[in-house]
Design a protein with these regions (language model features):
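Conserved phosphate/ATP/ADP-binding segment of small-molecule kinases
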Residues: 159-236
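Charged C-terminal helix
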Residues: 43, 94, 271-309
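Short pre-catalytic strand/loop immediately N-terminal to key active-site residues, enriched for Gly-Thr
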Residues: 49-55, 237-251
Length: 309
């Protein structure tokens, strides 16, 4: 087991290794988590299949901000539209599965998509649409953020939909990024049984046994350190970051999975993409910690604005 730590202050990432251990020549400058050595003539493309957050903190909006922060062109296929603020979700309209498919196929038919991430899929029927496309090899470097349970613990997917994730979608994923509640749902375990790094590691391996290459179980704030446990071909890796005391944590899961997809689109290998994404979110949390956007949980600082002169 290896452990990597990220502080809450300045985070650097000088490792620009690609999938073959060679430098990609692509890093980011003045953006949380990574830096850029040169600009490609044409930016790579990442696709987000997710719901819309009208408050701009999570969902497809957080994904697009994350892609832009990495200078990756972001495309979207919306699964649902929410009436949402920093304080509450007042309504949700789920789009028809056939229209979700049409959005995805329209993007894939025009843009050279290098990576794809999923967020809120809302229904079993939409999970099946995405799984069918993944099985056909049309969703490259797929990152699955299994949005199954709300932050308050309310189920967002029925048991049939969870089964579809396990048997139809996760087998085609390069990376899966459940939080503790979602890991509990995917492993049919009580949440209280997952509140340790060894238990998180075991849950990650159970989910990975369904066919994913990497599984990142996000521990949040188990103690004064935020632990994420990664199960992958290299074994188990524990990513640590100092706890940041802020209410501005809306969309952290969306931003993490989008940052993984962005780094994959830029040429990083799986574990490097995960590590860079963890650093990106840690910097975003630190940067936006004192913001006062809205009455509830605000977004993170995707663009390093707080660090800018």
């Amino acid at each position: 087991m290896s452990i990597l730590s990220f502080g809450s202050g300045t985070i650097t990432d000088d490792d620009t290794s690609g999938a073959n251990g060679e430098g990609t020549g692509i890093t980011l400058a003045n953006v949380p988590g990574v830096s850029r050595t040169h600009r490609p003539d044409t930016p790579p493309v990442a696709l987000s299949i997710a719901g819309s957050d009208s408050g701009g903190g999570a969902g497809a909006q957080a994904d697009l901000k994350t892609f832009a922060a990495h200078r990756v062109h972001g495309a979207t296929a919306l699964t649902a539209i929410t009436a949402q603020s920093t304080a509450a979700v007042r309504g949700v309209v789920v789009l028809e599965p056939d229209f979700v498919r049409l959005q995805i196929e329209t993007v894939l038919g025009d843009l050279s998509v290098r990576s794809v991430k999923t967020g809120m899929l809302a229904t079993r029927a939409i999970v099946d649409v995405v799984a069918d496309l993944a099985a056909a090899g049309r969703l490259p470097q797929l990152v699955v953020d299994p949005v199954l349970v709300s932050s308050s613990g309310h189920p967002l997917m029925d048991p049939d939909g969870i089964e579809a994730y396990l048997t139809r979608l996760i087998p085609h994923a390069l990376v899966v990024t459940p939080n503790l509640r979602e890991a509990a749902a995917l492993t049919d375990s009580p949440l209280e049984d997952l509140l340790s790094v060894p238990a998180m590691s075991a849950a990650a391996e159970r989910i990975r046994s369904h066919g994913a290459t990497y599984v990142v179980v996000k521990g949040g704030h188990l103690t004064d350190v935020a632990h994420d446990v990664v199960a992958g071909p290299e074994g188990t890796t524990v990513l640590e970051a100092a706890r940041i005391d802020t209410r501005n944590d809306h969309g952290t899961g969306c931003s993490l999975s989008a940052a993984i997809a962005a780094n994959l689109a830029l040429g990083a290998d799986g574990l490097t993409a995960i590590r860079r994404a963890k650093a990106f979110v840690a910097r975003g949390l630190a940067g936006g910690a004192s913001w006062t956007l809205g009455a509830g949980h605000g977004p993170i600082d995707h663009f390093g604005w707080s660090a800018s002169p």
